[in-house]
Amino acid sequence: EFNSENSGENIEIGYLVNRQEKGVYEDIIKDPIDYLRPNRLVPENEEFSKIAKEVVAGKLGQLAQARALYDHTIDRMKYIKYGDGWGKGDAVYACDVKTGNCTDFHSYFIALARSVDIPARFAIGASIPSTRNEGGVDGYHCWAEFYTDGNWWPIDISEGDKCSALSTYY
């Protein structure tokens, strides 16, 4: 029983996890309009619009445009966690500093995607390396999803940056 008398005590919780690869999946909501709207950390601005339009120029279809934005983000950003400001998912910070963690990579991508009318959103969970069958989870991990043709497409740009051999996998 949990109550104030045992507050502060350590507890151990175990889970059995069935890991599955997340692939493209159909939209249940059917209205991705909310994922085009700016917010405090992923705002609309002229810089995002300018960059995104340059990156997608000549690309036909949102799938090709999203891939171009992915490639641009992986080329521009570096997975480096130091200094002040990283890890907040601030797209302006990520655009200016060009470094950060998964949150920063994906906020930048989402800002660019939304600038060219591609709905995009964060997804968050845990990253468990495929080579490890048991043990602890080191913390949260996030990725982005973009919407086109009735489906959400998950992408993981920061993992693609950390492991260039997998950059085309994500």
Which sequence ranges carry the predicted segments?
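Secondary-structure boundary elements
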Residues: E9-I13, V17-G100
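Solvent-exposed loop/turn segments at secondary-structure junctions
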Residues: N18-E21, R76, T99-C102, S127-S130, ...
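A broad, low-specificity signal for short, low-complexity segments enriched in glycine/proline
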Residues: K81-D84, C102-Y108, W143
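Non-catalytic surface loops within mature trypsin-like serine protease
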Residues: S4, V17-E21, T148
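Conserved structured core elements
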Residues: L63, R67, T99-T103, S107, ...
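Hydrophobic/aromatic-rich core segments of domains that either
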Residues: S107-Y170
